[in-house]
Amino acid sequence: MAKIKRALISVSNKRGIIEFSKVLAGYGVEILSTGGTAKLLRDSGVDVKDVSEFTGFPEMLDGRVKTLHPKVHGGLLGMRGNPEHVAKMREFGIENIDMVVVNLYPFEATVAKEGCLLVDAIENIDIGGPTMLRSAAKNYPDVTVLVDSVDYATIVDEMRENGGEVSAKTNFGLAVKAFQHTAAYDGAISNYLGARLGEGVDPFPPTFTFQVRKSQELRYGENPQQSAAFYVERDQHEASVATCHQIQGKELSYNNIADTDAALECVKQFTEGPTCVIVKHANPCGVAIGSSLLEAYDRAYSTDPESAFGGIIACNRELDLETARAICERQFVEVIVAPTASPEAVQVVSSKKNVRLLVYGEWPQTVVPRLDFKRVTGGLLVQSADQELFKNLQVVTKRQPTPEELIDLQFSWRVAKFVKSNAIVYGRDGMTIGVGAGQMSRVNSARIAAIKAEHAGLVVEGAVMASDAFFPFRDGIDNAASVGIRAVIQPGGSMRDAEVIAAADEHGMAMVFTGMRHFRH
């Protein structure tokens, strides 16, 4: 146990600090502080000694040097049980500091502001704060270090239970948190400055640092022989699988999380009406828009009832009673995810205790740029996320698509973006008719889409086709025409585009180029 007799407090985030300081003062703790924190505490009736008075050395260089002094760091690093340390501290008049409460200059918040200049960023790089945190954390058996106001209550409770003392176990956990905090802080600085080594801003600096936090231990990974955990990024607020709230059901598995991510990101593409996406093994097997969520689910399910078994269902509207009842009565489902769920829907789903029900809230219509990461042996592939749909829509055939066909082409194109390559999607009237995924040849994906439609009893005649990448040969067009496809949307860009367009003209099909590919591996 470490008895708290003296604490150094210097915080940029003042939340809860007055109340916490008053508790410390109630235990007779001497409080050292600097600048704005010292003024706030004094104004609130807390007795405070300035760090400059404690060290006998004034603040200098416009406040850049406040706590960088042997009396501060000696007081933090000196080991109480080491006679040599104790003797040396006595020789130089260094007194123990038993607690450090510090959070750092808001560097990330500063650089996130539009128009932030380099000089502003530099002035918000904290030097003394991280140095104190590291000193205190290194000497955790004797020093309590706090970087997060969330932990104030825990320390207050422990001090009350132990007569003003804090356990080494608690101190160790707080020390780990402090090192995590300074690592993330330095990483943010390194990323920001590294991106500005040359002219302009490089999105891929020479080194890249990011920190994730463990959210959940998983029973196993993609397969039972693999161990796994789910980590989430810091300060995430966007509606995503990482920020979903689980209302009921078993713990999410590794595959549940991966598939829910695919389903949720797909359904977020659709805002024009109630939409349902059913995903299996990270591929949409049914997507549909309806006049109601129930109709959207019915239509999505009808695309491929076999593959929907054990799938993930994502909705872009509140899960209502009728839709929840239809899902639970009709199929085995692993996860249902929606912006919200009505109390009646929650009650229905609760009858299936293993079904995981997640809500993700509303999501912004504006796209927030982000990076995607893919691990390869010995390295990491980093790219900007594929967040655009097309460059422009260009009709390249003699026949123009009808207004109805154009709507279906754009619907099917959005679905194809989320299907594993090579991806082919047949669609009509705002629903998928057949999905061909993950084949090594594009024509085979087209054949599978037709087979899926036939097995589901759906009519392909008059439907449209979306392809995530160009057709290298005309065979994909010939195959589509043979089953009744009337219009095609694809990126274009093949050496044989002219041959492919000619094939579409021969069959009286309309074809639209998007100028943008959507490979998904």
UniProtKB/Swiss-Prot annotation:
* Native organism: Pelobacter propionicus (strain DSM 2379 / NBRC 103807 / OttBd1)
Show the Pfam families listed in the entry: AICARFT_IMPCHas, MGS
Q: Does the keyword DNA repair apply?
A: no
Family affiliation? Belongs to the PurH family.
The encoding gene is purH
EC number(s) from the headed UniProt entry: 2.1.2.3, 3.5.4.10
UniProt keyword annotations, A-Z: Hydrolase, Multifunctional enzyme, Purine biosynthesis, Transferase
Q: What is this protein called?
A: Bifunctional purine biosynthesis protein PurH
Q: Name one GO molecular function term.
A: IMP cyclohydrolase activity
